Each structure stands twice: as structure tokens, then as C-alpha cells.
């Protein structure tokens, strides 16, 4: 618990008193099922042992004082519960504001302020959901602090709403759901249209999940994420003229092939094809994992990346370089981009004995080609967000 002692010292230095409670919210990695969540499809994410810590103490007034060790230079960000508007100078604390504002709108009134210290071990902008981790962390803190008695699925939904309506990023439910509902050593098969979910045990004996970060600067809100979403919505509208469906995730591959010529724009056709095929790939991948067939699972991961590169066009030279170098390496059974894309991370399944060699070799070759180093994390699968003292 050394990290908690370190954070306690920081809390005392900044707020001149002890914290009352400490919470942890994981990051997440999606093993397969990318850009399917807002298309009514399935995703297969898991929560990680890296994440965000939150130390908190209540106040008697209506002020919130927030400090992040990851944004030291911004100091303490102070705002009033009477003025929960998004503003640029409040930077990362807008995520906290957004969750409070959304709780209020749902009738869970937050009437007291608090002091909060955040520390995240998830690299910002890595695509491992540092923003959703902060949102869910804020949600469970509010739930505990004000004894609101809200179940985790409702917290998750409100956190997604905060990101959509307050922050302005049109994300699906996957990030917040996997962070709130994660389970140690399991991945979650989530149907994003119904929120039905089931856990699959990850039997990784002899293998490791290795995440490689491109370290490319990226911003989700101003990336092409919203553009992809509207392209899929436009394709869906055309398909709805001939078939009674609510989302692309309802179509099988065969149904899509039969109907695809209805989509007049070739770009929108490619976007829709990815959404349909990726959803089916995800379902096949879960079956293979449940049968302990890691080889097929890896093959489907590779196919997922190709589709994200060619049909969805969200990869870029950095992610493509990491994946192609991974697939040339010994002991790798699957590799793909994970997250929204446009930078961020890849996830690879690597034989344990080859992990060091994998990292050294890719680091050197990527740096030579791209001009700066990637970072690597060997991750374990964790429980969802929770109070830890």
C-alpha cells in the first residue's frame, strides 16, 4: 500500500488534512469489438490493474477542490456546485463536473463540496480510457460520499451521459461499463444495444497481454471519432429503407452482403461493413476463448485490425507499424489496435517466454521508423471500480 501512503502525504500537503476515503477505478482494454459499441454490437473488454486513485474528504460548503498529480502544473482546480459549466481552464476537472451535473439532473442532488486528489497510472491519451476511469471514479465517490445507493450499471450509464452531453464526445457505453463492471481475470461480453453481459474467464496460462502505446499525441473529442459515428448512422438509415433494423449490430454477414448495394456511398459502405463484420468476429472470438482456442482468438484479433485499417480507416502509420512489427515477432498469436484509434495503443497476446524480446525488438524498430519511442505495459485483468480502504 506504499502508493496510498504517498498519496496521503500529497493530500495533506495540498489540503492540510487527512483524506477520509480512498477509491480506485481501473483503465480498460478492449480485446476485440472496436467501434461496435455505438453501432449496437458486441464488445469484449476487460478492466486493468492500472487505473486512477481518488482520495477524498467532504467539505461543509458547496465548493469542490480538485487536484491531479498527473496535471501538477494546473494546481488545485476549484469550482462551485452552483456553477457546473464546462470551461476550458478547468481542463481534466470538467470530467468531474460533468458527472456531478449528470447526477444532479437525475435527481441525485450533490449538495456538499469535497476535496479530491487524483492520481492515474494510465497514460493520458493512450486510448486506455483515462477519461472514463476518472468519470466512473467520480461516480462511485459521489455514490459513497452521499449515500445515494445507486447500482453500478446506473452509475455507468450516467458517466457515459456525462461524456456525451457535458464533454461532447459521442462515445458508446463500453469504456464506462467495463471500468465499472470489470471482474478479475475475466473479460466481459457486452451487448451494447441491450446491456446484457456475461463474463468469460481469460485462461492465459503461458501468455501475457502486452499493450504498446504509440505515444502519438491525440485528442478524442476533436478526432474523427464523431465523423465515423455519423457515417455509420447514414449507412444505417439507407439500410432501414429495406430492412426493419435498429442498428448495424443486428445484421449477420450474409444479410449485409445481400443488402449492401443499398448504401450509395462507397465510404459509408466500408464503415458499415466493418461494424457488421467486427460484431460477428467478436462473437466468434468469445466462443474460441471459451473453448480455450487462443490461436483462433489471435487470428480474429488480426482480422479486426485489418478491418479497422482498411474499412474503418482509424489506424494510421504508428498503430500499423506496431501491429506489423508484432506479427513479425516470435511468440505472438494476435495483435490489433485497441480503443478509438488515431494513435493510442495496440494489444497483443504474446508467449510469456518471448515478452522481453518482443518489447526490445519492437521498441528499436518502431523508434527507427517513427522517430520516437513507444511504451509497453504488461497488464493483468482487474476488478471494476471500488472503494479500497
UniProtKB/Swiss-Prot annotation:
It is found in: Cytoplasm. GO terms for biological process: galactose metabolic process. It comes from Clostridium acetobutylicum (strain ATCC 824 / DSM 792 / JCM 1419 / IAM 19013 / LMG 5710 / NBRC 13948 / NRRL B-527 / VKM B-1787 / 2291 / W). Keywords: ATP-binding, Carbohydrate metabolism, Cytoplasm, Galactose metabolism, Kinase, Magnesium, Metal-binding, Nucleotide-binding, Transferase. InterPro entries: Galactokinase, Galactokinase_bac, Galactokinase_CS, GalKase_N, GHMP_kinase_C_dom, GHMP_kinase_C_sf, GHMP_kinase_N_dom, GHMP_knse_ATP-bd_CS. Gene3D superfamilies: 3.30.230.10, GHMP kinase, C-terminal domain. Pathway: Carbohydrate metabolism; galactose metabolism. Its EC number is 2.7.1.6. This is Galactokinase. It catalyses: alpha-D-galactose + ATP = alpha-D-galactose 1-phosphate + ADP + H(+). Catalyzes the transfer of the gamma-phosphate of ATP to D-galactose to form alpha-D-galactose-1-phosphate (Gal-1-P). The record marks 28 as: Transition state stabilizer. The active site is at residue 175. Mg(2+) binds at residues 131, 163.
Amino acid at each position: 500500500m506504499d502508493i496510498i501512503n504517498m498519496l496521503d502525504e500529497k493530500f495533506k500537503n495540498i489540503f492540510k488534512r487527512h483524506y477520509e476515503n480512498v477509491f480506485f477505478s481501473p483503465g480498460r482494454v478492449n480485446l476485440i469489438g472496436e467501434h461496435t459499441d455505438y453501432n449496437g454490437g458486441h464488445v469484449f473488454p476487460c478492466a486493468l490493474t492500472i487505473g486512477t486513485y481518488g482520495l477524498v474528504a467532504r467539505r461543509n460548503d458547496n465548493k469542490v477542490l480538485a487536484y491531479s498529480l498527473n496535471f501538477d502544473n494546473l494546481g488545485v482546480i476549484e469550482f462551485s456546485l452552483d456553477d457546473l459549466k464546462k470551461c476550458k481552464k478547468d481542463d481534466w476537472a470538467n470530467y468531474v463536473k460533468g458527472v456531478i451535473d449528470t447526477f444532479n439532473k437525475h435527481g441525485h442532488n450533490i449538495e456538499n463540496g469535497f476535496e479530491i486528489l487524483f492520481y492515474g497510472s494510465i497514460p493520458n491519451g493512450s486510448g486506455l480510457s483515462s477519461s472514463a476511469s476518472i468519470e466512473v471514479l467520480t461516480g462511485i465517490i459521489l455514490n459513497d460520499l452521499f449515500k445515494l445507493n445507486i447500482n453500478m450499471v446506473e452509475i455507468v450509464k450516467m458517466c457515459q451521459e456525462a461524456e456525451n452531453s457535458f464533454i461532447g464526445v459521442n462515445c458508446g457505453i463500453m469504456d464506462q461499463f467495463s471500468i465499472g463492471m470489470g471482474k478479475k481475470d475475466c473479460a466481459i461480453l457486452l451487448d451494447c444495444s441491450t446491456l446484457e453481459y456475461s463474463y468469460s474467464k481469460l485462461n492465459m496460462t503461458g501468455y501475457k497481454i502486452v499493450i504498446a502505446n504509440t505515444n502519438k499525441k491525440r485528442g478524442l473529442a476533436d478526432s474523427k471519432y464523431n465523423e465515423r459515428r455519423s457515417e455509420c448512422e447514414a449507412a444505417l438509415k439507407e439500410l432501414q429503407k429495406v430492412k426493419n433494423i435498429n442498428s448495424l449490430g443486428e445484421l449477420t454477414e450474409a444479410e449485409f452482403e445481400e443488402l449492401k448495394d443499398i448504401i450509395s456511398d462507397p465510404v459509408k459502405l466500408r464503415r458499415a461493413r466493418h461494424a457488421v463484420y467486427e460484431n460477428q468476429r467478436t462473437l466468434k472470438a468469445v466462443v474460441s476463448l471459451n473453448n480455450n482456442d487462443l490461436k483462433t482468438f489471435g487470428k480474429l484479433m488480426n482480422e479486426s485490425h485489418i478491418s479497422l485499417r482498411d474499412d474503418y480507416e482509424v489506424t494510421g502509420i504508428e498503430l500499423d507499424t506496431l501491429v506489423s512489427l508484432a506479427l513479425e515477432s516470435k511468440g505472438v498469436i494476435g495483435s490489433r489496435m485497441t480503443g478509438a484509434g488515431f494513435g493510442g495503443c495496440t494489444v497483443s497476446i504474446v508467449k510469456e517466454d518471448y515478452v522481453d524480446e518482443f518489447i526490445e525488438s519492437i521498441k528499436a524498430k518502431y523508434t527507427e521508423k517513427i522517430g520516437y519511442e513507444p511504451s509497453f505495459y504488461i497488464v493483468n485483468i482487474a476488478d471494476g471500480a471500488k472503494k479500497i480502504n
